[in-house]
Amino acid sequence: MPFSPQELLYEGKAKRIYRTADPRVYLCQYKDDATAFNAQKRGSIAGKGEVNCTVSSHVFAYLAQQGIPNHFLAQTGPTEMQVRALHILPLEVVVRNRTAGSLCKRLGLEQGLPIQPPLVEFYYKNDALGDPLVTPDHIRLLQLATPEQVERLGSLALAINNHLQAFWRSCRLELVDFKLEFGLDEKGEILLADEISPDTCRLWDRGGSEPRVLDKDLFRFDLGDPVAGYQEVLQRVLQAVGSQFLL
């Protein structure tokens, strides 16, 4: 059953979250706004909201089929989805399958090296501090999550990685790394939240001699046309799983 937005709860860089008539359900509205480097670079990618909403809807539905609990309920429009109301943990969980991005800059590594087993990192969601990398001990010190929750986040992230690698392979893409966010439901259970899209996943097409970027790095580093890149990801997803709204 569709719910109309009633009160804007939160507006972030890429989405707006609204209350609905049902306190257990929020409406998530995706925007075309694009940011990088902790919002130091700003712009817009035409159609990004629709791409990210539709891709995320399909990915969340796929993950639910694989037994991964998440907040997705239904896609109710091109840029809108209904989600479960959660208390979002102030952590980003990053899983890396190859060296890329900030990991290379931070540790002086060559880009594109395989990482086995995958690397799991935690970042404190705090714009004023620049979302710093934190250890489980830092998380305990800051009381961001319990040790048991941190352990659960790590195990969930690795399980999600296995499923996402299979999903993106079906779209003829390699999942280099990605960012996850989680929240707690009314029972205190941890559910996957936020989005899974070219904004949050580093996706390479390795069909040629050199990897071809099809993600937010197109905008972040001016590597090509982000509109075309995002639309290509959407078309590959739709070809792989079908083009119907997941109602």
From Swiss-Prot:
It comes from the Bacteria. One of its GO terms (biological process) is cobalamin biosynthetic process. Its EC number is 6.3.2.6. Gene3D superfamilies: ATP-grasp fold, B domain, Phosphorylase Kinase, domain 1. CDD domains: SAICAR_synt_PurC. Pathway: Purine metabolism; IMP biosynthesis via de novo pathway; 5-amino-1-(5-phospho-D-ribosyl)imidazole-4-carboxamide from 5-amino-1-(5-phospho-D-ribosyl)imidazole-4-carboxylate: step 1/2. It is an enzyme of class 6 (ligase). It catalyses: 5-amino-1-(5-phospho-D-ribosyl)imidazole-4-carboxylate + L-aspartate + ATP = (2S)-2-[5-amino-1-(5-phospho-beta-D-ribosyl)imidazole-4-carboxamido]succinate + ADP + phosphate + 2 H(+). GO terms for molecular function: ATP binding; phosphoribosylaminoimidazolesuccinocarboxamide synthase activity. The keyword Transit peptide does not apply. Keywords: ATP-binding, Ligase, Nucleotide-binding, Purine biosynthesis. InterPro entries: SAICAR_synt/ADE2_N (IPR028923), SAICAR_synt_PurC (IPR033934), SAICAR_synth (IPR001636), SAICAR_synthetase (IPR050089), SAICAR_synthetase_CS (IPR018236). Belongs to the SAICAR synthetase family. NCBIfam families: purC (TIGR00081). This is Phosphoribosylaminoimidazole-succinocarboxamide synthase.
